[in-house]
Amino acid sequence: MSQMGLKAAAPRLQRIVSNVEVERKFNPGPKFASLFLSDGQAKLQAQPHEFYGNKDSSSFTVIRQPGKLIRDTYYDTHDSNLCKLGLWVRQRYVHVLPSNPLRFERRQDDKAVVERVLPLPTDESRANEQWNAKLRLGGNFSNTQFVEFDGKKKVSDEVLRITKTKTRLEDLRVVSDLLTRRLSWKVTRLANGSAPSAKMTIVLDEVTEAEAINDGSDKSGFIHTIGEVELFEELVTEDKDNEGHEAHRKEVATRRMDELKEFMLVNAGLFTTTPKPIGKLSAYDTWSNSRS
């Protein structure tokens, strides 16, 4: 084979950048609420604070992040084909809130819930919405590995790729419109004194149906509170083709999931997983189907 033929047969190497996210869900119980949602903690922002997760005094340090109001409009085909393929497509609007705008109360069942004291984003603000998609690499609905796509073109390309060009972004329909009030804490130091291997965030979400809030009513009755611990990493390769990058991405996602699992097991009293945590989309689908 000629030298030119060898060059033509060689795989094309390039700089490839992608995002990897792994997450594990938990039920925010009374211990979580007492440590993270007390009046004193609610006033702390951009200040490191050490938490002790268990009786052996295993500790980690967090910094509370600004609260957010998030509107997610999810899209799929009429037969939910994208969901079946492990792809979730949405338009997301994020509004960063001023210090301590969210107040929490505790219900009789000891679940922490956010008081609904914030307005829904207006139609004028929807121009700031961004297209986003999450493709599941592995795991299940409680413990999941994702790769993310940001921007309309990347999302559109992924929809075409995963459906083998059978479905365009314009062919999708709205399947849910949800409003999330979010509190989050960035983990800066683990029990061994080291920093997490990637950006680690503890998240508490209260989710409602956006349309019901927009109508000024509570007619939907849908409300769901769920916690997550997430690891997010930007992955860059310089010496791999697309196939090699994809394989490396899956390896990294698996390692990060193992790290997340260990962190939550060490602090099992804070991040309870019994009964099995239910994600917001699963909870919404169950609620919606019960009303059909």
Label each PLM-derived region with a short phrase.
Residues 2-292:
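Phosphate-end processing signature that detects enzymes handling 5′-triphosphorylated RNA
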